[in-house]
Design a protein with these regions (language model features):
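A donor-sugar binding/catalytic signature common to diverse glycosyltransferases
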Residues: 19-20, 47, 168-205
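A nucleotide-sugar donor-handling region in carbohydrate enzymes
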Residues: 40-112
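Short acidic-hydrophobic, aromatic-tinged amphipathic segments that line or gate anion-handling sites
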Residues: 49, 68-69, 155-159, 211-217
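Leloir-type glycosyltransferase catalytic cores
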Residues: 53, 212-251
Length: 251
């Protein structure tokens, strides 16, 4: 919301307006971010795009001037942090070991209401892998006020800062998220990523088969197993299905 507020003020006061990460589209107008980015793109003087796909989407909206593909500043920052920061105390503080847990971040309204949280948590009960969930206070209040059962393997921790988040991303086995920012970070770090959304702005990680949109129909446990394409004993996921089904899956 601060993005569109600042953009409107700049436009009204005739201040030169540059939109970084322009052209991102989910085409889901129920997302507040989608409305903000659409409006900001159409009133900006200079549009700096993180992906070529964003440039193409702006062309479809007849925004062709002062549009530049400059690359992803978020990934430049992540690379810098990976090169300069390696304090893994967040792992010991939460009794975690490298490559032995999944990282989950969900915060969007359609995933954090009582009904959906119960459904997601019910599915997580079938996963025989620790799932670390840095939880937003609003989501925590929903869980507590509705007495939602927390699966044994789900470890709720307090929200973490950016540096510690990169450590969790770098040391986890795979990621479950509905975050926009985590998706390209997972791709950059070669961490398989299950996106708890029906659409996404980040197309490249999908095309490269690093990330996948959850279909909200298949059992989450089975969906993860099929996506990772590894033997059942390697990912420690118990889906209560015949072991023969997984014998031919490639590591």
């Amino acid at each position: 919301d601060s993005t569109i507020a600042g953009a409107i003020v700049a436009r009204k006061l005739k201040i030169y307006l540059i939109h970084i990460e322009a052209g991102m589209r989910s085409y889901n107008k129920d997302m507040p971010e989608e409305i903000n980015r659409l409006m900001t793109d159409h009133i900006s003087d200079l549009l700096l795009c993180s992906t070529q796909d964003s440039v193409d989407k702006l062309k479809q909206e007849n925004i062709k001037e002062n549009v530049h593909y400059v690359g992803n500043l978020q990934l430049e920052l992540l690379k810098y942090v990976c090169d300069t920061y390696n304090d893994k105390s967040i792992l010991s503080e939460n009794n975690l070991t490298e490559n032995n847990f999944a990282l989950m971040t969900i915060h969007r309204e359609y995933n954090t209401n009582e009904k959906m949280l119960k459904k997601i948590f019910l599915e997580l009960q079938k996963i025989d892998t620790d799932v670390v969930f840095p939880i937003h206070p609003r989501t925590k209040n929903i869980i507590e006020s509705n007495n939602i059962n927390i699966p044994k393997k789900l470890k709720l921790i307090k929200p973490v800062d950016y540096l510690n988040m990169t450590i969790l991303e770098r040391t986890c086995k795979f990621i479950i998220t509905d975050s926009g920012g985590v998706q390209p970070e997972a791709w950059f770090l070669s961490k398989k990523c299950i996106i708890m959304r029906s659409e996404t702005e980040w197309i490249e990680p999908l095309k490269n088969n690093n990330n996948i949109l959850y279909d909200y129909k298949t059992s989450l446990c089975k969906f993860i197993q099929n996506f990772l394409k590894v033997q059942i004993d390697e990912v420690n996921i118990n889906c209560n299905v015949s072991e023969n089904i997984f014998n031919k899956l490639l590591v």
